[in-house]
Amino acid sequence: GYGLTRIPHLNKDLAFTLEERQQLNIHGLLPPCFISQDIQVLRVIKNFERLNSDFDRYLLLMDLQDRNEKLFYKVLMSDIEKFMPIVYTPTVGLACQQYSLAFRKPRGLFISIHDRGHVASVLNAWPEDVIKAVVVTDGERILGLGDLGCNGMGIPVGKLALYTACGGVNPQECLPVILDVGTENEELLKDPLYIGLRQRRVRGPEYDDFLDEFMEAVSSKYGMNCLIQFEDFANINAFRLLKKYQNQYCTFNDDIQGTASVAVAGILAALRITKNKLSDQTILFQGAGEAALGIAHLIVMAMEKEGVPKEKAIKKIWLVDSKGLIVKGRAALTNEKEEFAHEHEEMKNLEAIVQDIKPTALIGVAAIGGAFSEQILKDMAAFNERPIIFALSNPTSKAECTAERGYTLTQGRAIFASGSPFDPVTLPSGQTLYPGQGNNSYVFPGVALAVVACGLRHITDKIFLTTAEVIAQQVSDKHLEEGRLYPPLNTIRDVSLKIAEKIVRDAYQEKTATIYPEPSNKEAFVRSQMYSTDYDQILPDGYSWPEEAQKIQTKLD
């Protein structure tokens, strides 16, 4: 009846047939009109296009997700290049900043530090019994925007929307979670509309015990092969939690490993332009947080695969943090940074560092808008015939340089990629270049699909190198000529399928899969797991019997 039209994964709106409306007792609750899903998509797109701001477009799509889930994903998949920047970066950053103001309907699970000792009970409130993927954040480092506390829930929600749209993971089996331990954001603490706990962040043993309880509760309820993706945790927690849980649970950190994989994929594609090996590069990072260190470690692993000893590979990588170049003997270096500290004088100015190190590749992941100055870009072009310049920080306002500056200040010779989308750039020569967007969405949907499909218990760093290689293989020579270092976003579902197929194939070879019998056709097996946006048959299967068999007996023998 009426309640059915309020259940997002069952609601079809005006696509309910007359028979469905009559038998489900919703006839009369809908206008006397029957339209296809394709026409429904057209209506959404027309409404989308008449809105003036991306934030309003975001709200439109979120309302649709809360009303008609199949249609929401049909719309996203109809033009993923158009809709991804709305449901995820960069618009999701603005949405998180406005999350309390725009709050309409809760989506996901809100677990607070005051629920310690009862996390399992809170999980029981979730209506779905089968969950295969969880995305969790504590809201402390949302994109490049800092501590947004409970407002960070927009990130797990948006991330899981892309699990489905880009990877085909069933949305009914996905769970977005915010762990609310407080916030250090003064504006939020004073905001009467803020939806989270009004207290300073809990840290130390109490925080760790809370995380332990959460991980144990999720794995106990949903199984050891339930994927738990960590998202937007602060640097002080991200590395140690990954290290702590990686071999204990089915988990990964997208900010560290997902970013690393997509960045390395871009570098591997760039090497087809520079015509040399990864181990021939000198790589300088602006930033030394989760993203930079994750990329650096995966580059080392890729160089080792080329046959370069680990110690030699590490020497090819330099990092710059807020205090300057990371060198041996510098005070207060973390263990993670210490690994990439080299013998060199201390330097603070990025322009001077670039002139001194003369990198072949410059990678920005520090969320400092405009950090790649005109001088730096011109120097990169002076040192290299084809300089590799990746401005990977999100959102767009935090990008180290725009695509236009990246190309024009290097006479169009830069091999450029960014974290947020940029428009194509037409050079004075008339050539149009399409900057590659190093979006983690090339990575995590395929990895998640593979984990769900074959029941992986642990997600190793090797999986992310494999993923990078598969992504790079999907880039054609024509794409490279156009400046693209990544496959077109509109092929992302096919890319995810290829990633998942390769990971699943390796998992069965290495005996790490847990779902048996082993499928003979891995591609068909993975494809069969992918979510369909077609409306489900709601009515019971109806069929006829022979007329003779249906005769009603009226006389007693």
From Swiss-Prot:
Stored SMART domains: malic, Malic_M
Protein name per UniProt: NADP-dependent malic enzyme
UniProt record similarity statement: Belongs to the malic enzymes family.
Catalytic class of the enzyme: oxidoreductase
GO cellular component entries: cytosol; mitochondrion
Main function: Catalyzes the oxidative decarboxylation of (S)-malate in the presence of NADP(+) and divalent metal ions, and decarboxylation of oxaloacetate.
Gene3D superfamilies xref list: Malic enzyme, N-terminal domain, NAD(P)-binding Rossmann-like Domain
Entry keywords, A to Z: Cytoplasm, Metal-binding, NADP, Oxidoreductase, Phosphoprotein
GO molecular function, one term: malic enzyme activity
Enzyme Commission code: 1.1.1.40
PROSITE patterns noted in UniProt: MALIC_ENZYMES
Cofactor note: Divalent metal cations. Prefers magnesium or manganese.
Annotated positions binding a divalent metal cation: 231-232, 255
UniProt-annotated site: Important for activity, residues: 255
Lineage start: Eukaryota, Metazoa, Chordata, Craniata, Vertebrata
Pfam families: malic (PF00390), Malic_M (PF03949)
Residues annotated to bind NADP(+): 141, 255, 394
Protein encoded by which gene: ME1
Principal cellular location given in the protein's record: cytoplasm
Any GO BP: pyruvate metabolic process
Cofactors, names only: Mg(2+); Mn(2+)
Assembly, per entry: Homotetramer.
Record-annotated active site: 88 (proton donor), 159 (proton acceptor)
